[in-house]
Design a protein with these regions (language model features):
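Extreme N-terminal starter segment of soluble prokaryotic enzymes
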Residues: 1-6, 51
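Internal catalytic-core helix/loop-beta-alpha segment
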Residues: 108-135
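Loop-to-helix element that buttresses phosphate recognition and phosphoryl-transfer chemistry
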Residues: 12-62, 113-120
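Short active-site segment of divalent metal-dependent hydrolases/proteases
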Residues: 13, 147-148
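Active-site catalytic microenvironments for nucleophilic, acid-base chemistry
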Residues: 43, 66, 70, 129, ...
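Acidic, low-complexity terminal tails and accessory targeting/binding regions
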Residues: 2, 73, 78, 85-97, ...
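Beta-strand elements within well-structured catalytic alpha/beta cores of enzymes
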Residues: 4-8, 137-143, 147
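Phosphate-coordination/substrate-recognition cap region in phosphate-metabolizing enzymes
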Residues: 38-107
């Protein structure tokens, strides 16, 4: 018996002020992001999805709903705090300011903000929860880029660090970082051991 968990990054966000939105409320999907989510849903339409978990943030909730609407059989939508965006001090900073930092979220932080190890612990706790709730099934979990990035590094036995996050191409992530509405799929055996990982971006399909 194997359990499959597909981590899906939310679609592209409407962000006219060009800020790092992080956990800020009211940031929903752009039209392109909705199309990306629909493409992911169509890709998963016949995958026998048993449930769609999602971060409580609006962009993830909207992505989950659009995916669910494409499935050939209904699947419950379940909000889960373990999937929410990283807790950092940079919410609301401009994209320009973040680019000057080289998007370094972790080099100068202290509690209560999250470290990569904290974030990975959340992802692994979610994996354990999902396997217990839906053993032998396939579920989708809509989350955020760094959570998915650290899960990928874990799958390849690499350290969860900000530096390692920049080397995801070595883990099969052709986009260098989990693309909007991309799928990172993890398959576990009955004992919870990871037996397969794959990355795919449905809206890139021709």
């Amino acid at each position: 018996m194997t359990t499959t968990i597909s981590l899906l990054r939310h679609g592209l966000v409407e962000n006219p002020e060009a800020v790092y939105y992080g956990r800020l409320p009211h940031f929903g999907l752009a039209a392109r992001g909705r199309a990306q989510a629909i493409a992911a849903g169509r890709y998963l339409a016949d995958a026998n999805i048993s449930a769609i978990y999602h971060s409580p943030l609006l962009r993830a909730e909207q992505t989950a709903g659009l995916v669910a609407a494409q499935l050939s059989a209904p699947a419950p939508l379940i909000a889960c705090d373990l999937l929410t965006e990283i807790y950092s001090p940079y919410d609301g900073q401009t994209i320009a300011a973040m680019e000057q930092r080289n998007w370094d979220f972790y080099g100068e932080i202290a509690p209560p903000y999250e470290t990569p190890a904290d974030i990975l612990a959340r992802v692994l706790a979610f994996f354990a929860h999902a396997r217990a709730e839906y053993p032998g099934r396939h579920i989708v979990a809509v989350s955020h880029g760094d959570l998915i990035a650290f899960a990928i590094l874990w799958a390849f036995g690499r350290p969860a660090t900000g530096a390692a996050k920049r080397e995801l191409i070595d883990c099969g992530v052709d986009d260098l970082y989990p693309a909007p509405a991309s799928l990172s799929t993890f398959r576990f055996d009955a004992d919870g051991a990871l037996i397969e990982y794959r990355y795919h971006c449905p809206h890139d399909d021709k």
